[in-house]
Amino acid sequence: MDIWRPEIKYLRYTNGFNVSELEDACFKFNYKFPKVGYCRVPSHAWCRNQGSFCATLTLYGKSKHYDKYFGVITGFTAFANTVEEAVNKLVFLAVDFITWRRQELNVYG
């Protein structure tokens, strides 16, 4: 079975569905503005049983000076049978992670 991953050149970007909720969380907790991409999963791919569509996001941190980025914090990928389901699942996972990370970082100061 071929190894497959979403490639930037095949992604289409969206700010529809629930992406505004993710944008609000990124702005509130000082992350780079999110670009949520989605694509169709090829029928020969190993992950096709997860769904027909894939949504992906790479989360970047931002410094307090607003001119420099820390770099990649983590990446998210969600699969579903429709674009809307995949993007909504991705947004839920990302917002949940951002909230959890904020709480954990506050524990240590």
Curated annotation (Swiss-Prot):
It comes from the Viruses. InterPro entries: Corona_NS2. It holds the Pfam family Corona_NS12-7. Belongs to the coronaviruses ns12.7 protein family. This is Non-structural protein of 12.7 kDa.
